[in-house]
Amino acid sequence: MERDGNLKPWGSLFCKTAETVVQRFYKRQLLNDIKSYMQIKQLLLVILLILFHNQQLVAQQNATQKFSGTVSSDDGLPIPGATVKIGEYIRVTDNKGEFSFDQIIPKSYTISIVYIGFKPIRKSITIGEKQKNRIEFVMDATTHELKNVDVVGRTKVTEVNRQAFNVTALDATKMHNSTLDIAGALDRVAGVRVRETGGLGSNFNLSLNGFSGNHIRFFLDGVPMDNFGSSFQINNIPINIAERIEVYKGVVPMWLGADALGGAVNIVTGDRFRNYIDVSYSIGSFNTHRSVINAAATSKSGFTVQLNAFQNFSDNNYKVTVDASDINTGQYSPGTRVKRFHDQYHNETVIANVGVVDKSFADKLLFGVTLGQNYKEIQTGARMVSVFGQWHRRGNMIMPTLKYQKKDLIKGLDLNFNANYNFGKEQNIDTAYRRYDWFGNYKQYEGKGSERTRTMYKYGNNAGLATTMLNYKLNDNHSFALSNVFSTFDRKGSDEINPSNNAYEQKQKTNKNILGLGYMFNTADHWSLNLFSKYIIQNSIVGQQNLNQTTTQSQFGYGLATSYNFNRNLQLKASYEKANRMPEATEIFGDVENFEGNSNLKPEVSDNVNVGLMYSFSLQDVNRFSISANAIYRNASNFIYYQFNQNQSKLVAGNRDGVTNFGGDIEARYSFKDWLTAGVNVTYQNIINQQEYEGNPPVLSPVYKDRMPNIPFLYGNGDVAFSFKNVGKKGNNLSFGYNLLYVHAFYLYWPSRGTSGDKYGIPKQLSHDVNLLYSLKNGRYNISAECKNLNDALLYDNFSLQKPSRAFYLKLRYFINKTA
Amino acid sequence: MKSTLKNACYAMALIAGISSCSKDKSNDLISENKGNYILTVTPVASTGVADYLLTADNLESGTLSTAGNGLEQDGTFRYYVTTNNKFFSMLYGQGNPGAVTTYNIQNGKLSKLSNFQTETVQAFAPVNNDLLLVKIPRTYGNKANWYQVDTDKLLITSEGQLDVANLTGNGETAHFSWLKQVNNKVFAPYFSIKACCADGFGTNYPDSAWVAVYDYPSMKLEKIIKDNRTSFIGRYFVDGLGVLENGDTYAFSSSVATTGGVFSSKKPSAITRINAGTTEFDQNYYFNFQDASGGMNITNWIYIGGGNFVVNATTAAEKGAYNTGVHIGIVNVNNKTFKAVTGMPDLDKIGSVTDHNFTPKDGRTAYMGVTLKDGSSFVYKIDAVTATATQGLKVEGGTITSISKL
């Protein structure tokens, strides 16, 4: 699943694989990628996809035959990931270029084999008792370009999209020349809104069909990112680290073994190349500098070294329009245009892995470490009238990792194990007893004080994680998966300016285990079924005064996902999950600064139903269309939400009766030949408060059944891209792209209350981004220029917090990969 | 092509089916009442809550609603004060600076005068022609900041710092419960807090009451007066002082000091006095409220004139450091009497009562907000002479958080 061309449903539009600049460039090197491992997650995906899309009929005759073979290139290297089709049967070659049809009815067939960058093989064969049942095929590399272009422009990811789950996969490789981070890329997905409080590195809140915060889980190659800390988050991970980003809206597959409740985002880094260097640097407005180095080297003996390093830096000193107050009298000067002056952000992260691949004892065994640090200045509070000039945060990450993969422990049984432990620390530093205004002037007060809450508290969460995944494929119709995710959290901290705090330091420890069991079944090419269950148990120890209170909570969840193919172009899918989410450590213990703990939180439970539809068609073969539509229904109870504590000094989590969401999204895409693509998506969600009684003691709530405030409910994206081949010189390509973001206005507070003309709200947002890319030598050198917020609109995701004004970026990227 | 069209039809039908299931909620709009009474109303919800300002011309009858009606304020946890014929709407901004919006009333409608910026403060009171604001630290060693807002200019005209670390003399920090102008001084009762760590609002000194006395406008500390007959005066964000017509100041103690999260004061809830013109507790005056009320403690009070206070009280079982009592009574501090008020809704129907209420100071009347568990709210007229409560104005769509008049 990690490679192009895998598991395409035969004959569908999506199968007419696009060949992008990058992919074309990669084609030779892919040969060297034969033995590269598959992440277990991806492996399971393969199995799911085989189950869901495999066109093989159940053998109806006893006299079936086995037929196998290999596919290799004209220079003798095996081709993994090539699609082999015999009649209605489809297989994809493995790492050694091998394929096998276990039960095939003997008769005459047309066999066809396709792989990007090679001339397709198409010939007649007869499978019968007297024929030989093993053939070696050799494919010739093409020199011409494939003419078919995928309408979606998301070739590699199409199959992820076709899972029975409500999932959208983004092909990150298409954005490697942009200056996006993961958050920016996600913002273009239907159903997703990333709400940021400012510029580079600012706090973000990703909402997926109305759920946000800890209801959404993030994964890196299937490993939960919960314990990664602030140095490695979606708002600082550059897009170049990722190969693909999968967004599960609602029902989350079992193999993402976590207690996500509102959805999940899985960042797939992949390792397409055994030997490569990918270096990029971008410079832009507001003194923004970002660079990324990705590299890998693998010896013939299987020793491998992989390195990903990235850095972000920005002053974020963009201009904002504010009501600037006089520092002494408090008088406002409305509509003052000022530059932000205390908003610098930078982070530096290195991920290094050393190990072996393709050994008898392991397909992959990697020891690694992720080192990172970040620094962030805090310019404003929850409103832009609150200005700060010294308050800042720091964090670091020291995380050893272990990855182990072995296929066919016994035939059909694959094992994947991951473990990591984060020794990183986080610190919030607010020691300046000052009050700043928007012009950078300040008043210095005497004594020990702060701009907000005096602290230098430094803490580590000592968070560890171990994931184990076992997958057993009984035969083409049945497979089983068992997963286990164990995580531990043990916060310790101290405050150097308030050492007596240590004496009050309480035990703050949780252990969580999630055991998942899944079964996958498909009868024929028409429908498939995926059943799964998860058992979550969490043990938390909360120190209270002098005794430790231990709480153990357990929940059982289950679900199913199914898809039905009316024909090659029309797929209907549906899924349901009874999902559970345990209270997070931060919610139980607080964070000592801004968040108060609540050890009485109950697990959150929700019913999730998704229904989806994908349809594609073409007119005269040059005009290609695809439409996908998803509907979603959620009903969450014991919903965990945040409110102010009794004396309104900190936030505290609580359970509420819940919210429901009934909504959906529609995406339509169009392409013309191989030089124009365009798309539009729209998301609507009707998120309704189901809390009938509120308060203590409870009273009937006037906003029961009202729409939840301060959540965007109608938004969309549009994009157009033009690409021109061989501009200036053969192998040099030029493309131009345009992106539009629209977010409908929404109220800050409950919609039904108050005189409508006097209500606070977040105005409509409309922003335009344009980009230009020129790539030389088939993608070895790339130069791109971008303009974000072209019309210099005042953009807000959160009330009063303005996002960056118009900005320009230039990015240079060099990519090369070599045969070992 | 035919099958293409067929598929398209399937697709459209499904999409139509999916998208056709929404319903709109319509609200009955109640036209805005004009009047000089201002009620601040908070729709009860856990998130996204704003306060709404509603005006009314009388508190004894009629109906108001926040549905499609009311002047939305930026957030809840707002505090309101009227002085100099102006209404001040102040945000409690979690330690951040915020905007204060001022209104007056013209033709029975609120009219915005201006915005100005202040800090989030924990105590405020009208003093002379000013509004005095004090920002109180919760961390040991910090200083409190005060600000004087000129209520004509609507600007901060002066500011300074108060040492709260050394007021108690016991190593703990002082946290003012409230401020009160008494004659030409500012009385600032405080409670002692550890200001640290896991027991920040706890104390090891739960059995004393203190009042810091400041000169105005210099805000120089003149004196600290202490009394060991009660626990601290007032509560967090609650005015524990009442000044009578003769200048005598009465103080209530709720007896809600905690140590390690547990109530630790051995002193009962009681009322003490500081005589007019003096800055000492009158050791000859002590009214044990707890005994007089059958074991209850005062949570809030409002002085209505003639020595009468309308008090909110909680039973021993209901006692909490922050909750407002739903038992209403009349205390006469001259006679040291307590009378329970009749005519309030049944206790099991009351959700909450308002703690910033209105009195014309006629010695007899107070108007108090009550929210029932069914979500409806009413203004109750409390008559101190008959010790009865009568249901008045109905407010739909929220809890009444304050009642005032311009």
Report the location of each language-model feature.
Chain B
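Short beta-strand elements that form the blades of beta-propeller/WD-repeat-like
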Residues: N33-A45, T83-G93, N128-Y140, K185-S192, ...
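Post-signal peptide N-terminal segment of secreted/secretory-pathway proteins
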Residues: D51-L155
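Beta-propeller blade signature
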Residues: Y52-D57, V100-T102, K143-L154, F201-K220, ...
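Repeated scaffold domains used in trafficking and secretory/extracellular systems
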Residues: L71-N84, F116-N129, T168-L179, S231-L241, ...
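Beta-propeller fold detector
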Residues: S61-D74, K109-E119, L155-G171, K220-R229, ...
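Bacterial Sec-dependent N-terminal signal peptides
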Residues: M1-L39
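Acidic, serine/threonine- and glycine-rich low-complexity intrinsically disordered segments
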Residues: K180-A317
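Intrinsically disordered, low-complexity segments enriched in Gly and acidic/Ser/Thr residues
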Residues: T279-G375
